[in-house]
């Protein structure tokens, strides 16, 4: 049993969830936790993992939502995460929904949150990220400002995109949080295609400008150049199979780098936590172990429908190396975690990666890539 689980977690879990989260970020920012683990997070068993033009030290990233405002990126990377995704950030700074808005369900090893994209705004976060450490693959997750109606969503996303483009290694488009009114409407085919087409057009323009290449010289028929920022879309776990397949088709048409599967769920079936207690928590997205199978099923659908052509970052209910391995076999080539990190502590990334490397060897795989999609025949 780790020091975190026996000593630190009971203290943090005795506090209101968001207070504990803020305290944890402050501890991380001091470097104490990462200093303890530094030098103990070598993952040479994997070799480098190359996806959408980026090189990852290991497959496990930290999902958006933990470090919304990019205040502890280097310290989080030092804990052994192969990449860190900050945000969700919006063009307009916003306080999010009223507190309390983050709740623990220890019996289910889950969280319910209705944060509502509380963040300092894309401009402030982009300025902070200019100082990001070299070597840490950094994703920035962008969402729609609450005050902006869906009819003006494209321009709102474009403004955030332009601000974070110079500082992000990849950009994730969040259209799936259940905590911003009507946001999930943007997952519908016509709205999503319009949004992603506009972002990719701006992506090409910004990349060509930064590379000193004029659009006329670059040409319009070329596939994504290496200097374009990889663009991914983060989707909900509560979609039907046909809706997922439609998003896959759009993603392929718009030459997206991949899909992040999945965000939190609004479904609360089968929880161990008493129903009255859950009801009293109010609305919000559920994450953690209850989401695991649902997100794995979405990963499998994406992999099968795209015939393995569309990279998937699998997220939802990863607590153990076995959970991670299951998502790899379903079709994920990279992984993210959030709730598992909250429950397992500072050694979480190290433990998952070591366990995953061991599992791959035991199952006879020579590399992680060899295992991708093996349980989801195309």
Q: Which ranges hold each PLM region?
A:
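A gly/proline- and charged-residue-enriched helix-loop-helix capping module
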Residues: 87-136
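Glycine-rich phosphate-binding active-site loops on the catalytic face of alpha/beta enzymes
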Residues: 82-94, 175-177, 258-266, 318, ...
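Intrinsic, low-complexity polybasic segments
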Residues: 205, 209-213, 219-221, 225
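Active-site glycine- and acidic-residue-rich loops that bind
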Residues: 145-158, 184-185, 191, 232-253
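Catalytic cores of alpha/beta
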Residues: 69-78, 239-251, 308, 318-335
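C-terminal helical cap(s) of enzyme catalytic domains, especially alpha/beta-barrels
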Residues: 94-109, 270-284, 342-365
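An N-cap/entry alpha-helix motif that binds or orients negatively charged groups
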Residues: 3-49, 113-118, 122-123
């Amino acid at each position: 049993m780790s020091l975190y689980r026996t000593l630190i977690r009971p203290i943090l879990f005795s506090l209101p969830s968001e207070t504990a989260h803020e305290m944890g970020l402050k501890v991380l920012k001091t470097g104490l936790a990462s200093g303890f683990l530094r030098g103990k997070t070598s993952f040479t068993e994997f070799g480098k993992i190359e996806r959408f033009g980026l090189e990852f030290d290991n497959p496990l990233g930290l999902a958006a939502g933990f470090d919304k405002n990019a205040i502890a990126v280097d310290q989080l990377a030092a804990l052994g995460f192969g990449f860190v995704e900050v945000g969700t950030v919006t063009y307009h700074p916003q306080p999010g929904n009223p507190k309390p808005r983050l709740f623990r369900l220890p019996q289910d090893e889950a969280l319910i949150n209705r944060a509502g994209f509380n963040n300092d705004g894309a401009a402030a976060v982009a300025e902070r990220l200019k100082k990001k450490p070299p070597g840490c693959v950094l994703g920035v997750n962008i969402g729609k400002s609450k005050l902006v109606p869906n009819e003006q969503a494209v321009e709102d996303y474009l403004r955030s995109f332009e601000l974070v483009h110079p500082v992000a290694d990849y950009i994730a488009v969040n259209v799936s949080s259940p905590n911003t009114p009507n946001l999930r409407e943007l997952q519908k085919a016509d709205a999503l295609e319009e949004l992603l087409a506009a972002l990719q057009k701006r992506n090409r323009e910004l990349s060509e400008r930064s590379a000193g290449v004029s659009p006329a010289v670059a040409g319009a028929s070329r596939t994504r150049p290496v200097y374009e920022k990889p663009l991914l879309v983060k989707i909900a776990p509560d979609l039907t199979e046909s809706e997922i397949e439609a998003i896959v088709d759009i993603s392929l048409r718009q030459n997206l780098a991949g899909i992040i599967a999945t965000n939190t769920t609004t479904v609360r079936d089968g929880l161990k936590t008493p129903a009255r207690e859950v009801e009293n928590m109010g609305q919000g997205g559920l994450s953690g172990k209850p989401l695991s199978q649902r997100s794995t099923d979405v990963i499998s659908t994406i992999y099968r429908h795209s015939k393995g052509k569309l990279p998937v970052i699998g997220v939802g209910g990863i607590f153990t190396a076995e959970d991670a391995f299951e998502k790899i076999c379903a079709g994920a080539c990279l992984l993210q975690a959030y709730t598992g990190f909250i429950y397992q502590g500072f050694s979480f990334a190290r433990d998952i990666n070591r366990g995953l490397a061991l599992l791959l060897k035991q199952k006879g795989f020579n590399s992680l890539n060899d295992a991708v999609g093996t349980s989801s025949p195309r």
